[in-house]
Amino acid sequence: MIQTQTVLDVADNSGARRVMCIKVLGGSHRRYASIGDVIKVSVKEAIPRGKVKKGQVLKAVVVRTRKGVRRQDGSLIRFDGNAAVLLNNQEQPIGTRIFGPVTRELRGEKFMKIISLAPEVL
């Protein structure tokens, strides 16, 4: 459950390290985002010579949450932290590598690129 002001780790090599959610996209008064949802983020911490700079406002897709995701068979997949992958305006990933596992829930038409780059799909 990601909401406004939540700080997330970045799970790609775009150059950002930590981002803060500033808006949950998809609905006029939507409060929470979970795995697979697109959010608007502000870069809070970035490495030098990265593709993105501190203070930049971008879109991101949530790939891991502490809350987890419930499957049809009743199992719950939970992670140690909240993480997102940064997207450009066409909703394609900015980075060329993904770090850490991602879930099968991202397997829609929009995020197949993230699934193919990820080292592990749960």
Curated annotation (Swiss-Prot):
Domain of life: Bacteria
Cross-referenced InterPro entries: Ribosomal_uL14 (IPR000218), Ribosomal_uL14_bac-type (IPR005745), Ribosomal_uL14_CS (IPR019972), Ribosomal_uL14_sf (IPR036853)
GO terms for cellular component: cytosolic large ribosomal subunit
Self-association state and partner proteins as the record states: Part of the 50S ribosomal subunit. Forms a cluster with proteins L3 and L19. In the 70S ribosome, L14 and L19 interact and together make contacts with the 16S rRNA in bridges B5 and B8.
Family recorded in the similarity comment: Belongs to the universal ribosomal protein uL14 family.
Any one GO molecular-function label of the UniProt entry: structural constituent of ribosome
Assigned keywords, A-Z: Ribonucleoprotein, Ribosomal protein, RNA-binding, rRNA-binding
GO biological process: translation
Role played: Binds to 23S rRNA. Forms part of two intersubunit bridges in the 70S ribosome.
PANTHER family: 50S/60S RIBOSOMAL PROTEIN L14/L23 (PTHR11761), LARGE RIBOSOMAL SUBUNIT PROTEIN UL14M (PTHR11761:SF3)
Stored HAMAP family: Ribosomal_uL14
Protein name: Large ribosomal subunit protein uL14
